[in-house]
């Protein structure tokens, strides 16, 4: 289901370049931005199991960010995925951590998580997400949606 775009939402596709360490061709990085979020939405998935992955959003112009939203869904297996968010205001030379969050998934319990993190960030040139697919075993990194707000 497409989430309506808020007036203060940053159009990541129009204002940034996204790089990533890997993607499953059936679940490409573009799925993060396609507005089909929520349970059952499209998703980005790593092409490599048991590998820590990175997604870097490089903005065309420095951005002010007041909120970071992302979603994760796992319906098939038990796993604990960790997401770390870091920002740079110097063109990607140095980053500072703004968020570390773990999500515990179980097919018979929690299968969907949405994070809405309020922040007060200025002149952001890069946002880097590091995804640990499973802190306690095997798994593949994935994210369902990524939204940023000015």
Question: Where are the predicted features?
Answer:
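Disordered, acidic Ser/Thr/Pro-rich linker "stalks" and the adjacent N-terminal cap
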Residues: 1-60, 73-77, 147
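Trp- and acidic/polar-enriched beta-sheet ligand-binding modules for extracellular glycan
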Residues: 10, 21-25, 48-52, 74-150
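Short loop/turn positions at the edges of beta-strands in beta-sheet-rich folds
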Residues: 59-62, 121-123
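Short glycine/proline-enriched coil/turn segments at helix->beta-strand junctions
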Residues: 61-64, 100
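Short beta-strand/loop motifs in extracellular/secreted proteins, especially
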Residues: 63-66, 81-83
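Short edge beta-strand/loop segments characteristic of extracellular beta-sandwich folds
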Residues: 69-71
């Amino acid at each position: 289901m497409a989430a309506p775009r808020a007036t203060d939402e940053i159009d990541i596709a129009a204002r940034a370049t996204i790089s990533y360490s890997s993607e499953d061709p059936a679940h490409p990085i573009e799925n993060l931005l396609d507005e089909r979020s929520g349970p059952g939405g499209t998703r980005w998935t790593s092409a490599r199991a048991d590998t820590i992955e990175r997604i870097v959003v490089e903005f065309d112009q420095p951005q002010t960010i007041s909120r970071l939203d992302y979603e994760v869904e796992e319906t098939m297996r038990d796993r604990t995925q960790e997401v770390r968010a870091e920002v740079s205001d110097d063109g990607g030379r140095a980053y500072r951590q703004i968020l570390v969050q773990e999500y515990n998934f179980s097919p018979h319990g929690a299968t969907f998580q949405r994070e809405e993190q309020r922040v007060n960030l200025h002149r952001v040139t890069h946002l880097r997400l590091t995804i640990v697919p499973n802190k306690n075993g095997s798994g593949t990194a994935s994210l369902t949606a990524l939204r940023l707000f000015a």
